[in-house]
């Protein structure tokens, strides 16, 4: 995946995970809350990977 794709997928997973987590908390559904928290974390990692790719590309471009 390219850096932009990673960042978009990451943000999508973050938002979807946050929604699931909040719905799970509101309804007392611990399984949904946990799945949402995991998806949110996955999204944060994907976003970080995209940012890291941008940083590496920027460093290489400056050489």
UniProtKB/Swiss-Prot annotation:
Gene3D superfamilies: YjbJ (1.10.1470.10). Pfam families: CsbD. InterPro entries: CsbD (IPR008462), YjbJ_sf (IPR036629). Residues 51-63 have a biased composition (Basic and acidic residues). Residues 1-63 are annotated as: Disordered. Belongs to the UPF0337 (CsbD) family. This is UPF0337 protein Atu0782.
């Amino acid at each position: 995946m390219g850096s932009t794709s990673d960042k978009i997928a990451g943000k999508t997973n973050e938002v979807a995970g946050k929604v699931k987590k909040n719905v799970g908390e509101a309804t007392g559904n611990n399984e949904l809350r946990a799945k949402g928290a995991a998806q949110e974390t996955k999204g944060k990692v994907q976003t970080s990977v995209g940012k890291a790719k941008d940083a590496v590309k920027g460093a290489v471009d400056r050489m």
